[in-house]
């Protein structure tokens, strides 16, 4: 983590030390949340819609922080403490992270995309970790606050930082890219997430491509070459991956089992293995292999790193319960692209009793939300899936789409989670496989937790 004197911090954020007697005070790390404070940290009070962190500065000092930033427009900065006056505390947080990166000379990989950012970040970390000291975004700390905090938590001996870059509107990736100044930028895909804010997939592609704006002059853009919206000639160096013959990394063979997925790439002798399911995760792994190659990681080392992959939870997580159920917990988030991929994956797996889907609302899809939900229901094969359970206001449209092919008694919709849980329990038996997939706000993991902890009906 960052360790600097208050004088150093003031210089890095272009601020003014309110009381020079504290200039040699040393801070150890940064925090913006008083609920997570540690002694000797720098507390940065941020202004939100419902609160102003400046109101908690005295509490922060009582908790043992060494210093705070203070917005000049806020009256009455605390006396007899190390206080750095700045024009805007959020901007100062971002400036501090940028300056810290520049001081250390750490190389950076930025990762964005509609789906798969976190998994791809984890995979790149696994590949690069075979040869380098690597720091990565924790969880999905990927916005204008989370990314700077990730950087400032980075050990000083970090050689490469893998930074996830999320967005909900145009301009956000631009800010993050210019802050991080990446050596390599990865775009995992262009989906439908944030359609509500960006209007179209074309708008989403434009927003994701902002990651190029901060790319170093000799940097590389790594992206899925099968995506028509990413077919332009880019001024930077590029590497592509996918199934098409035009890609630099072309997928050859894929095979799946409960243990994970094996795959090969044309022109590379190694067979790669990832301990997670899904062809879309193979694409994410190929992005990691390409990123690793850019930093000099040989295919055999990339294969070793990927085989030991540890991914962030609730992303196609295969769980075996004591009751004999197999559960695919993919409840962290959902978009039409990722939901269809999860459905297809479940359909492809063999050796189970019944195969069932529990699908809920996909949020932030804008005017096309009804259409997207119906499409997801319509792709489900009645020959490969035994039962479909849907949940939520928009989940009803998934059920409507599924009923184009399914008998009515094989598709059920629920508006109450307790009723959904009861129905799943009544229909599930030892040896069955159940997929859970919905947007984060639907909290389907609550049902997964109940199925793990309690016996079937």
Curated annotation (Swiss-Prot):
<dbReference type="InterPro" id="IPR051046">
    <property type="entry name" value="MurCDEF_CellWall_CoF430Synth"/>
</dbReference>
<dbReference type="GO" id="GO:0008766">
    <property type="term" value="F:UDP-N-acetylmuramoylalanyl-D-glutamyl-2,6-diaminopimelate-D-alanyl-D-alanine ligase activity"/>
</dbReference>
<comment type="similarity">
    <text>Belongs to the MurCDEF family. MurF subfamily.</text>
</comment>
<comment type="function">
    <text>Involved in cell wall formation. Catalyzes the final step in the synthesis of UDP-N-acetylmuramoyl-pentapeptide, the precursor of murein.</text>
</comment>
<keyword id="KW-0133">Cell shape</keyword>
<dbReference type="InterPro" id="IPR036565">
    <property type="entry name" value="Mur-like_cat_sf"/>
</dbReference>
<keyword id="KW-0067">ATP-binding</keyword>
<dbReference type="GO" id="GO:0005737">
    <property type="term" value="C:cytoplasm"/>
</dbReference>
<dbReference type="GO" id="GO:0005524">
    <property type="term" value="F:ATP binding"/>
</dbReference>
<dbReference type="GO" id="GO:0051301">
    <property type="term" value="P:cell division"/>
</dbReference>
<comment type="pathway">
    <text>Cell wall biogenesis; peptidoglycan biosynthesis.</text>
</comment>
<dbReference type="InterPro" id="IPR036615">
    <property type="entry name" value="Mur_ligase_C_dom_sf"/>
</dbReference>
<protein>
    <recommendedName>
        <fullName>UDP-N-acetylmuramoyl-tripeptide--D-alanyl-D-alanine ligase</fullName>
        <ecNumber>6.3.2.10</ecNumber>
    </recommendedName>
</protein>
<keyword id="KW-0547">Nucleotide-binding</keyword>
<dbReference type="Pfam" id="PF01225">
    <property type="entry name" value="Mur_ligase"/>
</dbReference>
<dbReference type="GO" id="GO:0008360">
    <property type="term" value="P:regulation of cell shape"/>
</dbReference>
<dbReference type="InterPro" id="IPR004101">
    <property type="entry name" value="Mur_ligase_C"/>
</dbReference>
<keyword id="KW-0131">Cell cycle</keyword>
<keyword id="KW-0573">Peptidoglycan synthesis</keyword>
<dbReference type="InterPro" id="IPR013221">
    <property type="entry name" value="Mur_ligase_cen"/>
</dbReference>
<dbReference type="InterPro" id="IPR035911">
    <property type="entry name" value="MurE/MurF_N"/>
</dbReference>
<keyword id="KW-0436">Ligase</keyword>
<keyword id="KW-0963">Cytoplasm</keyword>
<dbReference type="InterPro" id="IPR000713">
    <property type="entry name" value="Mur_ligase_N"/>
</dbReference>
<keyword id="KW-0132">Cell division</keyword>
<dbReference type="InterPro" id="IPR005863">
    <property type="entry name" value="UDP-N-AcMur_synth"/>
</dbReference>
<dbReference type="Pfam" id="PF02875">
    <property type="entry name" value="Mur_ligase_C"/>
</dbReference>
<dbReference type="GO" id="GO:0047480">
    <property type="term" value="F:UDP-N-acetylmuramoyl-tripeptide-D-alanyl-D-alanine ligase activity"/>
</dbReference>
<dbReference type="GO" id="GO:0009252">
    <property type="term" value="P:peptidoglycan biosynthetic process"/>
</dbReference>
<feature type="binding site">
    <location>
        <begin position="113"/>
        <end position="119"/>
    </location>
    <ligand>
        <name>ATP</name>
    </ligand>
</feature>
<dbReference type="Pfam" id="PF08245">
    <property type="entry name" value="Mur_ligase_M"/>
</dbReference>
<dbReference type="GO" id="GO:0071555">
    <property type="term" value="P:cell wall organization"/>
</dbReference>
<keyword id="KW-0961">Cell wall biogenesis/degradation</keyword>
């Amino acid at each position: 983590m960052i360790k600097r004197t208050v004088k150093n911090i003031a210089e890095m954020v272009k601020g003014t030390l309110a009381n020079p007697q504290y200039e040699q005070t040393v801070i150890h790390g940064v925090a913006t949340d008083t609920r997570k404070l540690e002694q000797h940290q720098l507390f940065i009070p941020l202004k939100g819609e419902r609160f102003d962190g400046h109101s908690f500065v005295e509490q922060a000092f009582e908790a043992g922080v060494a210093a705070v930033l203070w917005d000049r427009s806020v009256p009455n900065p605390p006396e007899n403490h190390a206080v750095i006056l700045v024009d805007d505390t959020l901007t100062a947080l971002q400036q501090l992270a940028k300056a810290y990166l520049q001081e250390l000379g750490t190389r950076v990989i930025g990762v964005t995309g509609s789906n798969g950012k976190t998994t791809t970040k984890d995979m790149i970390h696994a590949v690069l970790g075979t040869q380098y000291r690597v720091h990565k975004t924790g969880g999905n700390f990927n916005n204008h606050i989370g990314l700077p905090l990730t950087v400032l938590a980075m050990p000083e001996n970090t050689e490469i930082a893998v930074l996830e870059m999320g967005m909900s509107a145009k301009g956000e990736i631009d800010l993050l890219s210019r802050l991080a100044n990446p050596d390599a930028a990865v775009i995992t895909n262009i989906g439908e997430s944030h359609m509500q804010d960006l209007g179209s997939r074309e708008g989403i592609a434009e927003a994701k491509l902002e990651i190029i704006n901060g790319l170093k002059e000799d940097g590389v853009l790594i992206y899925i070459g099968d995506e028509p919206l990413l077919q332009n000639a880019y001024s930077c160096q590029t590497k592509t991956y996918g199934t098409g013959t035009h890609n630099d990394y072309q997928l050859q063979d894929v095979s799946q089992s409960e243990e994970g997925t094996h795959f090969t790439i044309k022109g590379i002798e190694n067979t790669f293995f990832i301990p997670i399911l899904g062809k879309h995760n193979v694409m994410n792994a190929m992005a990691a292999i390409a990123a690793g190659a850019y930093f000099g990681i040989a295919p055999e080392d990339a294969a070793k790193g990927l085989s030991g992959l540890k991914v962030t939870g609730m992303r196609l997580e295969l769980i075996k319960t004591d009751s004999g159920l197999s559960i695919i917990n993919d409840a962290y988030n959902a978009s039409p692209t990722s939901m269809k991929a999860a459905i297809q994956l479940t359909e492809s797996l063999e050796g189970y009793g019944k195969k069932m889907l529990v699908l809920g609302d996909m949020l932030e899809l804008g005017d096309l939300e009804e259409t997207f939900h119906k499409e997801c229901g319509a792709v489900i094969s009645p020959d490969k899936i035994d039962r479909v359970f849907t949940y939520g206001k928009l989940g009803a449209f998934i059920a409507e789409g599924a009923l184009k092919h399914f008998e009515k008694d094989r598709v059920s919709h629920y508006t109450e989670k307790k009723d959904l849980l009861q129905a799943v329990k009544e229909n599930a038996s030892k040896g069955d496989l159940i997929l859970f997939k919905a947007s984060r706000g639907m909290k389907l993991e609550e049902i997964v937790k109940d199925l793990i902890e309690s016996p079937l009906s």
